[in-house]
Amino acid sequence: MRLTYFLTVIVVATLHAGGTALATAEAPNHAAIVNVASADNVHSLDTTAEIGGRMLRKVKEDTVSKKDHEERGPGAILERQTAFVKKLFSRQNAIVNRAQGAFQRQNAFVNRDQGAFQRQNAFVKRAIQRQNHFKLSDNA
């Protein structure tokens, strides 16, 4: 069974169980809510001139909060998110740069050690060649 049919059956069953669908279908002449201001609101408007009536006070508008609450696009949110991402990447780049610097220092140390090792090997090879040369010249 498809999902749309399943959802349609659920909506119809819910409306039928709640009596919403049948009430409008069975009694089309049933009184509906009228789009007129309620009597309480009209009465309160009339009594504002009297001393005992409820009077509403005007509140000073705060321009900062008005700017914060006005509808706007996602620009401010995106600016905050991009600032956060830039800050995150700058921290990550700093960590990567430190790691690369440490790696380069380690490589320089290893290269220096390898150079010393190669020089030592060359010295040992020359010493062995000299010994072999002297042995050959002694035997001749």
From Swiss-Prot:
The keyword Nucleotidyltransferase appears for this protein: no
Recorded GO CC terms: extracellular region; host cell cytoplasm; host cell nucleus
Signal peptide span: 1-21
Expression triggers: Expression is strongly up-regulated during the early stages of infection.
Effect of residue 112 to A: Impairs interaction with host ADA2 and subsequent virulence
Subcellular locations according to the entry: Secreted; Host nucleus; Host cytoplasm
Keywords: Host cytoplasm, Host nucleus, Repeat, Secreted, Signal, Virulence
Annotated function: Effector that suppresses plant defense responses during the early stages of pathogen infection. Suppresses cell death induced by effectors and PAMPs in plant hosts. Acts as a modulator of histone acetyltransferase (HAT) in plants. Avh23 binds to the ADA2 subunit of the HAT complex SAGA and disrupts its assembly by interfering with the association of ADA2 with the catalytic subunit GCN5. As such, Avh23 suppresses H3K9 acetylation mediated by the ADA2/GCN5 module and increases plant susceptibility.
Protein name: RxLR effector protein Avh23
